[in-house]
Amino acid sequence: MVKRNNNNSINYEINKIIPVQTTKDINSKREKEIHVQIKKINSNRTFVYENIHRHILLVLENFGSTKNLFLVLSDCLATLKGYDSQEYQLQLELQTISDSTTTTTTNTVSTVATASTSKTATSKNVISNIENNTNKSQPLESNDLTPPSSKSSNSSPSTSPSKRVSKSKTRVTKKPNQVISTSSSGETENLTTTSTADTTATTDTADTTDGTNTRTSNTSSDDTTTESTKKRGRPSKIQPDSCYVCRRTFTSYWRKGIFNDQNEDLCNPCGLNYLKKGKKEQISKNQNSIHNILN
């Protein structure tokens, strides 16, 4: 029941019974009313247009005067103007309502975006603070306290002169298609073969004396220089720009042909056709199709 002693409780009970309408609900309700009125005006206008000829016929039959006909036409025109004016006012009101709704929606979206941006920035700050605190509280490891090593990476363990073992020497017999990479110390690191080859490696173990070690290292460096000088290999292929006949830029296999005493690049179909019909016939450069080559 409604408590009349307390005004706040009375308002609370009334709000429970009669819910408060929001601006959006009121606007949508008014928009529905405007659309109903516009529809009614259009219906009345259509009725006037459809029945005006009946009024004219009735005036001519009953009165037979052009003066009365002029009055009837004036009344119809005034009625139509009134309908137009009412519709124009309703359209303006409808436009105003839609503009206000759009503005309210835009403000709401901007407010939500601002709130989400501030929340994201706050969360990023919290995360960065947690990371900083974690880094500060992290204990030092034993590796961090170890001083850097004074030995260089290129240093080698010292051995007695009489016990020093010479570096091994490797001789490789290869075919022209083999590619051998050697280090500056004379050791063979990589061996890449493009065709089948017989490779024989002989390793000579040197004596333990200093003089023998010196001669072996000199011989190894000389052999490395000789081997690197004798390197031979097929040069890398240069991809042709286009076919001499059909101007094709891509093919599975490039062939050669002689035109005007010069070697020209041909695609696979044009090269096969060239080999079939003769190598020394002139082919016109203006042909674009391989079906009418050498015709």
Swiss-Prot record:
Compositional bias, Basic residues, is annotated for 164-174
Composition bias of kind Polar residues appears in: 127-145
Alphabetical keyword list: DNA-binding, Metal-binding, Zinc, Zinc-finger
> What is one process in the GO biological process aspect for this record?
regulation of DNA-templated transcription
Q: Which SUPFAM superfamilies match?
A: Glucocorticoid receptor-like (DNA-binding domain) (SSF57716)
**ZnF endpoints (GATA-type):** 243-270
Does the record's keyword annotation contain Methyltransferase? no
Task: Note the SMART domains from the entry.
Answer: ZnF_GATA
| Low complexity composition-biased segments | 115-126, 146-163, 181-227
Ranges for the region named Disordered are 115-240
Q: Which domain of life is it from?
A: Eukaryota
State any single GO MF term.
zinc ion binding
DNA-binding interval(s): 229-241
* Protein name per UniProt: GATA zinc finger domain-containing protein 23
User: Which classification does the entry list for the species?
Assistant: Eukaryota, Amoebozoa, Evosea, Eumycetozoa, Dictyostelia
